[in-house]
A protein has these predicted regions:
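Long, acidic (Asp/Glu-rich), low-complexity accessory segments flanking structured domains
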Residues: 1-56, 63-248
């Protein structure tokens, strides 16, 4: 009788172990944000871009005749401070909240301002807070934070003439700071110091932007990856976050 009881207890223990390990898969946490590359989109229909899976979007913001922020859908010549082919920044926020979430990944929004009107940039901040507040995180300098800590979150990056506006404190990353660089494709393709750029991308973020005026949209988009540049706005890679070492 004792051996039967022992056998039953052993069987019950095996069942518990199976239930613990087989039915509940072990979660593997991903590495740091700066350890992943992401292909992105710019000057593209935003709902279409998001629905095909991109997690990196850059918008070029201008001020309309009412000082409202609008996003250009076509590249403008350098120095222009207006755009005719545009959508409202408010609509961009609505598209993001409707189509980009929920997700296990963050959504990166890069904002390039082409206006010096603080009232317009303050409106950008207002629309973000009104529409996307529950997905926002106010952490700063997040390059080395775990990617999984930003699941279902919006990561904001910008720079330049947003200093002193309501948008500035909402940013997680800024290419005006030392830990982030925004390079043109030509700058990433022909860095002045390739070794220094490769070292920089070990713990920092580089975002690579296309140069339509130099017709680089059709160039090999993956070349900057050789130096570790993470965020490529016109790469042809599959959407999502890809571990850099897996590209070797």
């Amino acid at each position: 009788m004792k051996w039967l009881l022992a056998a039953l207890l052993a069987a019950f223990f095996v069942y518990l172990m199976y239930d613990t390990f087989a039915e509940k898969p072990i979660l593997v946490r991903r590495k740091r944000l700066c350890d992943y590359t992401a292909s992105g989109s710019v000057y593209e229909d935003i709902p279409t871009a998001i629905k095909r899976g991109i997690r990196l979007l850059e918008v070029h913001v201008y001020s309309d005749e009412r000082d409202q922020p609008v996003v250009s859908m076509v590249p403008q010549n350098s120095g222009w401070d207006f755009t005719d082919d545009n959508v409202s920044f408010e609509q961009v926020c609505v598209d993001i909240v409707n189509d980009a979430f929920p997700s296990k990944d963050p959504f990166i929004l890069s904002i390039v301002s082409h206006t010096d009107k603080s009232v317009t940039i303050n409106k950008v901040a207002e629309h973000l807070l009104t529409t996307l507040r529950r997905h926002m995180t106010y952490e700063k300098n997040i390059q080395t934070a775990p990617l999984d800590s930003f699941a279902n979150k919006l990561i904001l990056i910008s720079g330049g003439n947003i200093h002193g506006t309501a948008l500035e404190p909402l940013l997680n990353l800024s290419w005006s700071d030392a830990g982030v660089r925004r390079l043109s494709y030509q700058q990433a393709l022909h860095p002045r110091d390739p070794s220094e750029l490769a070292r920089f991308t070990k713990d920092h973020i580089v975002i690579v932007a296309p140069q339509p005026e130099l017709k680089t949209l059709t160039a090999n988009p993956n070349t900057p990856l050789a130096f570790g540049c993470q965020w490529n706005l016109f790469a042809r890679d599959p959407p999502g976050f890809v571990l850099k070492s897996s590209r070797a």
